[in-house]
């Protein structure tokens, strides 16, 4: 057995949470103060990612969220933030929960994610999602027709974008002509002598006729020689490709059975946050049932993997929970302070339908308009709060109820109103008082390879003043 331990970061504002007269918890600050808060949060995310590596955490996961004055989350570019962390770390692996594919041009996210894999020395865990908040989805997705107000269209767009990214990462050159994307566009004129010279070389590995549809001169065209022809592009190459082959492991945050089954069929690890422990094992069973039915899909074709999580094969169903460790002698005070930030999160999430998934297995679905209290979140074991020993016991209880062989657990420390220093203190206490006990109880941790990437030109700086 083994346990892998990560950190999930959603970027909540560090401004104090306040309960408004109508009972809704929000940021307590002006828009200008929220802007400054998120600047501090961004720097804190980089600091905490570097600290996580030094404390021995295995994974660092970030969300993608935009345009949020209410305060519960901020993470506009997880790939960019993680690239900053990657340049200062050696071991920790970088995931996104998730890159929201309907908000991106698929080749743009393919390039940027591959860049993170290269910069980190092969430490990318590529997370993908569909999005659910209309303020973000309609603002970003309008250009690509990926509205969430038509769920089937959104899903179809997501699946096509995923297919394109996999082609870009695994084929030396490729084309794609689907419902939403034509890549390269069939009308693209490209009569370039350098392209023809390159693909006429045998070592290129592709021929001119593979990548170009060579045509006659266009007597009616004006402009450059590239356009003065009927020669058009047939295929393109995306650079860079990831270091990991055939591609990095892909992840998806899941709640619905349909998403769980799609992930299992498509070699994608599942990741869950807002569901009670009573539902966890059934969702894992659905994932494994679908995987077995489809011949254990895996990017490296390694066959069956252990139930729940397989640390050696890096496959399965990850579990994430809020975690807050109470200080000895300050338990009541710390617990009371923690409740309001949790309700800030859930006053925001609830209206999107997340309240519905809080019901236990076999229990009627909750009213989407219900007030989700911090006490309910703790009762459902979505938030693990207590002394260090109590946190260990609660995490092990979740592992046992989920039926895990190996275990993949991700802790969510940050919450609205907590400073960077307070979040770092939680990380440090967990690493020193919780993590060793979990590692011992679960048979140790993973053997993660260290990056050999070198970003400081030491030879070039020799003798330079201030170096």
Regions found by a protein language model. Name each.
Residues 72-96, 157, 427-440:
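Alpha-helix-loop-beta-strand connector modules within alpha/beta enzyme cores
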Residues 64, 85, 116, 126, ...:
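Conserved, mostly hydrophobic/aromatic
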Residues 53-54, 82-91, 113, 117-123, ...:
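Acidic (Asp/Glu)-rich catalytic clusters
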Residues 59-79, 100, 274-277, 410-423:
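Glycine-rich, proline-tolerant flexible connector loops at the mouths of alpha/beta enzymes
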Residues 6-33, 150-241, 278-405, 439-467:
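An alpha-helical appendage that flanks or caps ligand/catalytic pockets
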Residues 3-9, 60-62, 93-96, 124-128, ...:
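Hydrophobic faces of well-ordered beta-strands that scaffold small-molecule active sites
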Residues 1-88, 247-248, 449-454, 461-466:
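N-terminal beta1-alpha1-beta2 module of alpha/beta enzyme domains
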Residues 255-293:
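A conserved active-site cap/scaffold subdomain adjacent to cofactor or substrate pockets
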